Amino acid sequence: MGSLPRLFRNDIKDFENTVTGYLKADKDRVDMLREELGLGNKKVVGISWKSIKSLHTQKKSLSLKEFGTLFKDVDIVLLNLQYGDVDNEIKEFTKSTGIEVLQCGSVDNREDLDGLAALIELCDLVVSTSNVTVHLAGALGKETWVLLPYVANFWWLLDRTDSIWYPTLKLYRQKKFQDWSTI
């Protein structure tokens, strides 16, 4: 399936009518998680700050501390969309910054993609490095800001701030190699 674009989309113009939101989260689960997390009508920003794919982990990832300071003094709820074991990292971040990151104990963000989709649906915005969360958010049609390394994967193309694959994504690129402060 991954090679189908080579057959059907041979030119940038072939992406002009890309459908957004072609996946849908389970509405009942979204409602259940909204209640479980006590979100009400609060503005929610879902965050994910690293990739666990070993080949590109270092260049695509940043620490939660680097990432989370983007949200200092902003009146929002941060919702953890990061997969993997990040409990200690979140506790340490909250302790050192005073910024709380809400976690959903009933969803394994790595193994339960339906649950992750429901969490993404709860968000007003997703902010993430390039990883599975970004692609799922794009497929759900969720407004997403993607933080890209200086040398990004080919599917993000060059010198673009939009994604031809997912119209709801906005791309932010490092200006200097391994320097996230330039975004």
Set out the residue ranges of the language-model regions.
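Catalytic machinery of carbohydrate-active enzymes
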Residues: 1-183
